[in-house]
Amino acid sequence: MAFRVSGAVLGGAVRAPRLTGGGEGSLVFRHTGLFLTRGARVGCSGTHGAMRAAAAARKAVMVPEGENDGLASRADSAQFQSDELEVPDISEETTCGAGVADAQALNRVRVVPPPSDGQKIFQIDPMLQGYKYHLEYRYSLYRRIRSDIDEHEGGLEAFSRSYEKFGFNASAEGITYREWAPGAFSAALVGDVNNWDPNADRMSKNEFGVWEIFLPNNADGTSPIPHGSRVKVRMDTPSGIKDSIPAWIKYSVQAPGEIPYDGIYYDPPEEVKYVFRHAQPKRPKSLRIYETHVGMSSPEPKINTYVNFRDEVLPRIKKLGYNAVQIMAIQEHSYYGSFGYHVTNFFAPSSRFGTPEDLKSLIDRAHELGLLVLMDVVHSHASSNTLDGLNGFDGTDTHYFHSGPRGHHWMWDSRLFNYGNWEVLRFLLSNARWWLEEYKFDGFRFDGVTSMMYTHHGLQVTFTGNFNEYFGFATDVDAVVYLMLVNDLIHGLYPEAVTIGEDVSGMPTFALPVHDGGVGFDYRMHMAVADKWIDLLKQSDETWKMGDIVHTLTNRRWLEKCVTYAESHDQALVGDKTIAFWLMDKDMYDFMALDRPSTPTIDRGIALHKMIRLITMGLGGEGYLNFMGNEFGHPEWIDFPRGPQRLPSGKFIPGNNNSYDKCRRRFDLGDADYLRYHGMQEFDQAMQHLEQKYEFMTSDHQYISRKHEEDKVIVFEKGDLVFVFNFHCNNSYFDYRIGCRKPGVYKVVLDSDAGLFGGFSRIHHAAEHFTADCSHDNRPYSFSVYTPSRTCVVYAPVE
């Protein structure tokens, strides 16, 4: 769509061009189609009522006079014709070939479809009728904000490109720097460019708390800020004078021997900028996600790099049969041990692992391999750091966050966003857009969503499934509406993008489309499954209840897709245990070599490790996730390098002498064919390729025909496949009859007991199993199999 804008003349700060002897100056500003700021005034409560009123009051925007003020990146700048702005379309964008995507995008209009009535959720689940007032209020608030954004910001598409207005943006004339800091009394740009002189480049403030300065190019036409220069903003605030990294900074680094990070003006020469060459893959029918962390992805005890990950780790992910890689800790975080979850610089990729161009080359290589790249994005909270983060940015307790106790997460020691604030919406929506647009990520896994959606943050609360727990006074409606907006934005502009939410509460409508009245995620993490396996592993498997296992795996809301997992990075952290460690414990260190006799503990552990993973994939959801190394039972936990620490509670936690020894992944163990880890890895690979071939996770047909408690046998159908699990510790069953829906001949397509997978080769793979015209377990046909103890076998009809 195109929208019209009107002109205005305002005042602003400008620095005289360097090397010209110029002095104080002023600029004429003109109004453009990209509105600058809205409704975030000093002392504003941040509620949507005040936010909307402030938005309506805004009628002018400040930008320096000139042809281009960085309104669009130089790669795909939208041109102004008269007073109309044509917004390019993403719906048919590709990244194949240098510049192809940008050229195509210029010829199309990007649109986020308008809201509907949001009533379909009541047809999908009539039980929601009892909570119609809450849900309709939620949807009306979403519609109102969409309307305000359309009216005052030119729509979600323009609003989410605010990174082209805030922070540093280069134009043909120079560089404009803008920052929202309503609490500051004065502000100045400081850094290498002016020898950190706070009097050299003072900024001016408008009525909405936005500070700004325009730096003209040098007399010789060169940039007023050289690429790679250190930059900060010095502000006189209610808390005193402080230097802060710009909130919208695109890159930051930690100088050797220093603790706080420095912001870096990042604008490399054209010949250095990475050009994407490969098209982004289409969204697969089912997701098989390999969860990763770049820094700890090396077998060596060190911080790994984007480049090494690109060259060494991506090919192994492809070989293993996964079709998506989820990368943690991309957003800059000054504390490495936070696993990337205490974000300090939201628009900056972590410099520990390399440069932004290195990250782009990683993503492009993944696309070449046909892998989706999902980013583990953190919008649920922010680091409490004041030196290099957003906390206390303008010297106030509020700014981007709630004030008082509501703005502090007592368990995570982090700050909590005020999602009812207009500028918070601008910042976070633009942040999501930035990673998709600039780096070509294919979607997000949103971290800590439960903490966002409830004022109790899901802490010390047990969710029982009662709808009052989801649609009551404990629900942070502003946060839920933000999630609706960000999903609306992502799916409207990038239809192939994937969004996954980490929600432990099971909120109804969470994974239903926004236009139907839902929150809008494509998937929710099926977090109860991993918890169930840990509970079971604390017991003897002789006591496991088959019906209990099946219930946990299949306990999902209709039409709301799930990504399931037996374990993720959470279980691999120090203080917890992986499934392999629960099963085999210290025996893993002494009895995993094939030239040494095994033990009953190892035999049991390897067998159950394979069974747990396959039944989780088979019944647990429409997507599957594995954390790197767990596919082969990685024997070491994760312990980031750290010194001693005293928590706010007063509890003392000893350090590990800043060692990297347990902060790595020993892929060499899974690759070593003389170790039993190799067989476990081979099974996981076969499991992924089986799903790739048969797409059973997303099959419309699922039928669980047997949950036999005495036999410890589970039998179910997914598509045309028949899965047989025998969890009994001793009993193997000959001529065991199982039901099926199709007549014919069945063959083995996956056998956990195969010698290749570290099993005992008790199944004859060449055997053909002919169905009988006799019903069994409420199935019209049946056939007989041999099912050894602690095995899982998958049968498929012979073509």
Curated annotation (Swiss-Prot):
It is found in: Plastid, Chloroplast; Plastid, Amyloplast. Gene3D superfamilies: Glycosidases, Golgi alpha-mannosidase II, Immunoglobulins. Residues 1-57 form a transit peptide. It catalyses: Transfers a segment of a (1->4)-alpha-D-glucan chain to a primary hydroxy group in a similar glucan chain. Keywords: Amyloplast, Chloroplast, Glycosyltransferase, Plastid, Starch biosynthesis, Transferase, Transit peptide. GO terms for biological process: glycogen biosynthetic process; starch biosynthetic process; starch metabolic process. Monomer. Its EC number is 2.4.1.18. Transmembrane segments: none annotated. One of its GO terms (cellular component) is cytoplasm. It comes from Zea mays. CDD domains: AmyAc_bac_euk_BE, E_set_GBE_euk_N. It comes from the Eukaryota. The active site is at residues 447, 502. This is 1,4-alpha-glucan-branching enzyme 2, chloroplastic/amyloplastic. SUPFAM superfamilies: (Trans)glycosidases, E set domains, Glycosyl hydrolase domain. GO terms for molecular function: 1,4-alpha-glucan branching enzyme activity; cation binding; hydrolase activity, hydrolyzing O-glycosyl compounds. Catalyzes the formation of the alpha-1,6-glucosidic linkages in starch by scission of a 1,4-alpha-linked oligosaccharide from growing alpha-1,4-glucan chains and the subsequent attachment of the oligosaccharide to the alpha-1,6 position. (1,4-alpha-D-glucosyl)n binds at residues 196, 232. Its main location: plastid. The record marks 570 as: Transition state stabilizer. Belongs to the glycosyl hydrolase 13 family. GlgB subfamily. Pathway: Glycan biosynthesis; starch biosynthesis.
